[in-house]
Amino acid sequence: MFLSSYENKIDKKGRVSVPATFRSHINSMGYNGFITYPSFNHSALEACSQDRIEKLSNTIDSLNPFEEKRDFFATSILSESENLQFDTEGRVSFSEKLLKHAMIKTNVLFVGLGKTFQIWDPKNFDKFKIVARKKAYQNRSNLKWENKQKGELS
């Protein structure tokens, strides 16, 4: 899983080190990089494994091929996606287009979200986190536990 948040600086060549725990998780799935695309909801980037983007692509493909919404999703997600590969030191290079969307200038914040992660400008994420915590608190009763499995703690 992708957990926690890590801030790293973009170097002079435009590369940024991906957190070791994120790289390790991605490598454990058999990949040497990740897919990223502009978020619909935020000035941030969504990031996931190849398997996850294929699942998303299959979901889009399941829509009627002649409906506009299928084209909207495919254009907004798949055509905007980039496959970023780790270099020998675990760094990636983001395109200017992606950095511009996320309003990232010098530092990058990798934010773990479980099966996926996001990439933010740290200051923008700080603002979002305040709102997110407030809304999570307001909606806390909607978060239901699955049936407890043998040996699990409450």
Regions found by a protein language model. Name each.
Residues 1-7, 12-15, 21-84, 88-89, ...:
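Flexible "stalk/tail and boundary" regions
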